Amino acid sequence: MTENPLGYEKISKLLKNFAVPSIVASLVGSIYNIVDQIFIGQGVGYLGNAATNVAYPFSTICLAIALLVGIGSASRVSLCLGRKEPKVAAKAAGNGIVLMGIFGIIYLLVGETFLSLLLKAFGATTDVFPYAKQYARITLIGMPFLIVTNGMSNLIRADGKPKYSMVCMVVGAIINTILDPIFIFVCDWGIAGGAWATVIGQIFSFILALRYLWRFQTIHFEKESFLLDIKESMKICSMGISSSSNQIAVTVIQIIQYNSLTYYGALTKYGADIPLAACGIVMKTNAIILAIVVGISQGTQPIIGFNYGARQYHRVREAYLLAVKWNLVVSTIAFIAFQFFPQSIISLFGNGDELYFEFAVLFMRTYLFMVLVNGVQLLSSSFFTAIGKSLRGALLALTRQTFFLIPLTLLLPLRFGIMGVLLAGPVADFSAFVLSVVLVGIELKKQKKLAYNLSHSI
């Protein structure tokens, strides 16, 4: 029996201890954008909502970078600890932290330099562009802090302290929520107020996350741990590529969707701006559900990674299947909300005319129709990453967005117009679900055989 609780504690208890704080922390990340959207929608109107939507790809790119290094280094740490290689684990964590800082600064400089060009590429219309530029120029300042915070949160969870990771994110979200109405309404800063509230909240989360450097328990840092090693950096990135590639694909599909909606929307009674605003609201609402799924997958990652490294395959299987059950409960609740209460949800994000609500309700009901199954692909991709099969995890992460959703979003509107953009979502969700079930089923059978051979060789 291994000394680490990950190797012997009851799986349901471990998942509760690791996943619940991860879910809260992940939810907080999505709440940053949603809170801004709600207050900006109330204070500026649907053009303000459209502006935050156009700027949203900056956040998804930021998350992709954080996942690349954060999940990658955390996965390396969990596997190395399971194999009883503490020095390698410390090196992986140290190199991961250094990479977070480097990538964060580079991202800020590139974003600010090409801001106008990028916003136009993201689908900003003439009316939306000035709002989007004002909002994005400010929020980009907080991106390096956000990358380090999100990346560190994965390492903190791998160290066995998911609650501290949660606190880091929650504190920033609370500050953001308090400052939003003050800056937007009291100070009358409009959309800029929402942006500054977000940045200040991110800085507070960053400070708390950085303080944990001196609190790691399973990882013992030395100066050499923070010396950038190319080979170790490549290993980190290879293990984080599946989670990161999924976010990159999310960014690509956002850009394609925004441009498709403005183009085909202009050919309908809704115009170009209404579909753009409605799309962002629906996506950010769905982001709450996806944040829960991401939290579950992040919570299972150290459990699966450690037990796979320790060759306790029955516990790997149990952890994955329990995570899927949790996801099904969340997805069922989401399906009921999206299908039966769409207008109530959309109303939270500000007022609009009849056409605005008509399209937004249609968008939510159609695009999110297969929400019941769309979390399985994320869980399965994370599963393969946790067991060190990063290439398979990366390919699976790309299935929904790259292999299904992007082609469908480009092709279906040619036949169905703007409805084609909406229909692409559920078709891609179901296709990715089927592929995930097949691939994970094959892997679990292999592990069952390994477990059998291991038990008979002792």
Task: Cite the ranges covered by each PLM segment.
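Short runs within selected transmembrane alpha-helices of multi-pass transporters and secretion channels
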Residues: 70, 139-157, 165-173, 194-207, ...
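Hydrophobic transmembrane alpha-helices of multi-pass small-molecule transporters
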Residues: 61-64, 176-180, 206-210, 288, ...
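Transmembrane alpha-helix boundary and packing residues in multipass membrane permease domains
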Residues: 22, 26, 38, 75, ...
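Helix-terminus/linker motif at the lipid-water interface of multi-pass membrane proteins
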Residues: 31-50, 119-126, 182-189, 251-282, ...
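Residue-level signal for short hydrophobic patches within transmembrane helices
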Residues: 12-31, 35, 58-65, 141, ...
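Transmembrane helical elements of multi-pass membrane transporters/channels
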Residues: 17-36, 138, 149, 172, ...
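Small-residue-rich hydrophobic transmembrane alpha-helices
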Residues: 49-109, 146-165, 258, 278-342, ...
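Short alpha-helical transmembrane segments in multi-pass integral membrane proteins
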Residues: 1-19, 77-142, 186-241, 304-370, ...
